[in-house]
């Protein structure tokens, strides 16, 4: 069973991830993952620190992700389970893009996370975005 400290550290990891991707901190983004960590998103799968760093650096300028460039990741309803050095987490995701006087929600979905403690620090081993609504989604 995870301790309250473990759960707090995992919540902090989620927040550091959001801050890094929203502010263009590619090194900080990659550092939230294990060295062999994997991110599975709507524009592809990225594995390992070099690939993750390149994805984060390209995030704001890649035409495939243009709708997301100025958006903020809002994550809530985080549920963490696990034991020892392994954990899973579920959270709801909403991406909000500032538009003048208002903001608009441009993505709704959830994350499924697999986490591992490495050298005393929690990291994402795998983070999967399950997007239900986003620009360009034609449904299934």
Each language-model region and where it sits:
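Short, low-complexity N-terminal intrinsically disordered segments enriched in polar/charged residues
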Residues: 1-32
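Short helix-to-loop capping/linker segments positioned immediately adjacent to catalytic or ligand/cofactor-binding
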Residues: 19, 63-68, 100-101
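A solvent-exposed, acidic/Ser-Thr-rich amphipathic alpha-helical stretch
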Residues: 26-93
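Short, surface-exposed coil-to-beta transition loops
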Residues: 73-75, 106-111
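A short, polar/proline- and glycine-enriched secondary-structure boundary/capping micro-motif
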Residues: 99-104, 134-140
């Amino acid at each position: 069973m995870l301790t309250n400290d473990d759960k707090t550290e995992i919540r902090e990891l989620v927040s550091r991830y959001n801050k890094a991707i929203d502010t263009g901190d590619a090194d900080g983004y990659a550092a939230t993952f294990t060295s062999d960590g994997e991110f599975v998103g709507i524009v592809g799968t990225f594995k390992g620190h070099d690939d993750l760093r390149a994805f984060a650096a390209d995030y704001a300028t890649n035409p495939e992700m243009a709708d997301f460039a100025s958006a903020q990741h809002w994550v809530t309803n985080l549920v963490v389970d696990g034991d020892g050095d392994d954990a899973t987490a579920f959270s709801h995701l909403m991406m909000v893009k500032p538009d003048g006087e208002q903001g608009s929600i441009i993505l709704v979905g959830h994350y499924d996370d697999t986490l591992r403690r490495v050298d005393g620090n929690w990291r994402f081993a795998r983070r999967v975005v399950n997007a239900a609504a986003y620009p360009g989604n034609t449904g299934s």
